[in-house]
Regions:
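A beta-strand edge to alpha-helix "cap/lid" segment located at domain peripheries
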Residues: 4, 57-119
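Short histidine/acidic/glycine/proline-rich micro-motifs that form metal-
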Residues: 15-19, 43-46, 90
């Protein structure tokens, strides 16, 4: 089960947070996140597929076209909570920003995602 949850977190940064096509992103959101999932960023609480998709669109549209999110350390799962340390920057180059996602899982999907930005 831990491997499956870790894989969900990795798929989230690849198929949701690095996806610039909102239609493809929505398909990934529905597969990875619970229907009533909530995204927590500093100063923001965003709930539901449409609102999360809009937030990710604003995020990726503000990044250079060659930027992607990548996993920097192995995902750690502790019971029903996961941690993923990520980097953001040009593919195959050192990240220009780093952060961490904390996910709470419910029924095999991400129910809540807490995003922490380091730089």
């Amino acid at each position: 089960m831990n491997d499956t949850l870790a894989q969900l977190m990795e798929e989230s940064i690849k198929q949701v947070w690095s996806q610039r096509n909102s239609v493809r992103r929505m398909v990934a959101l529905e597969a990875i996140y619970a229907k009533d999932s909530t995204l927590f960023e500093v100063g923001e609480i965003i709930t539901g597929y449409d609102a999360i998709n809009d937030k990710v669109s604003r995020t990726v549209n503000g990044m250079p076209a060659d930027f992607v999110f990548t996993r920097l350390k192995p995902v750690i799962i502790n019971n029903n909570i996961g941690r993923l340390v990520w980097g953001l920057g040009p593919k195959d180059k050192p990240p220009v920003a780093t952060g961490m996602d904390i996910a709470v899982f419910e029924n095999g999907k991400i129910k809540s995602l807490y995003v922490f930005l380091d730089t």
